[in-house]
Amino acid sequence: MKAWGGPDRPADDRERTLREIEAAGIDLDPTGSHDAGDRDHDHGTGPHQHPHHQSRPGEPPVIGIVGAGAVGTALGVALDRAGWPIHAVASRDPGRRDRFRSLVPAVRAFADAVPLVEEVELIILAVPDDAIPRVAGELHMYGGQAMVHTSGLLGADALSGAMAAGTQAGSFHPLVAFADLERAVAAFHGATIAIEGDDQLLDLLARMAEVLGATPVRLAPGSKPAYHAAAVLAAGGFDALLDAIAELGRLAGLDEAGSLAVYAPLIEQTLGNARALGIDRALTGPATRGDRGTIRAHLAELEARAPDVAALYARLADREIGIAERRGSLTPEAASDLRSAADPALARPD
């Protein structure tokens, strides 16, 4: 089984990630084909010929990025620092163009993506998911070019509007949180990147991930919505959970920084336990003990002082009870009894 990883990545971290990915049944060997289509934009007149800026054998492709938001800028900066220069960027926002140019000084900047296509070999669409089909449909690729998007939800078929004979389409989705530029650039090293495309393009995208120090994986066909929903829970969903923790921390006299300082070690320990022992064995708390009174007391307090958090607590408690039942800590009867205790309506004071 073939796998890729960045040459500068610590061996133990890389091997651990690869073992976990392989154990999860994810195919690390991109040997399947993806038919991106061969329709020509001139309706059967044959493939366009790419006019400018072709890379030499062994060199990185000539890259252009459409979109200079958080993802496009961080990816462009990371690739440029890793020795894969960005030739051009396109953004309708002049402030974003100027910022990208300040970070990647040699880049050519365009307000429109159409002239960018004339100058590059690999086009990266780093635009919002809803805009990808429309933007792709406005761009006419040339034979020998490839286009990828950075969406975690959409497949390569979202780029069908840009396809012509002799072109390729794919996707390149980094599992990175793009809240801060420098932190995101650093986070590529050690991240996982989901790639999609035919064999030749997959090889290129795997090398592109490798230079960033990331591990590329190819997902099962049709699995991207579930994969991306999990990513949203791991990032935005987890941040929402931290917000709920901080809200309860305020009731205990802690500010946000104080709550993070108090609960971060427990969060990190739980993640470490899950990685070492598995999710089921990592579960702790009243659900594992069948502690009905504690759950009722928590919900009564939250209903009175933080009702929004009470609803979240109840939903998570139901999930915890399911884990406890699955691992054998609770009988089906005990789990059913505990679920009734986790109903916020039953915990409200009369």
Where are these regions (language model features)?
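NAD(P)+-binding Rossmann beta1-loop-alpha1 motif at the extreme N-terminus of oxidoreductases
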Residues: K2-P115
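Phosphate-coordination loops involved in phosphoryl transfer and adenosine-cofactor binding
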Residues: E59-V62, G144, G190
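Hydrophobic Val/Ile/Leu positions in short beta-strands of Rossmann-like dinucleotide-binding domains
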Residues: G64-I65, L125, I195
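Short phosphate-binding/catalytic loops that engage adenosine nucleotides
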Residues: W84-P85, T167, A214, L254
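Rossmann-like NAD(P)(H) cofactor-binding subdomain of soluble oxidoreductases
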Residues: P94, V104, R108-R183
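Interdomain hinge/lid region at the active-site interface
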Residues: G272-A334
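NAD(P)-dependent dehydrogenase/reductase Rossmann-like domain
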Residues: A324-E325, S329-D350
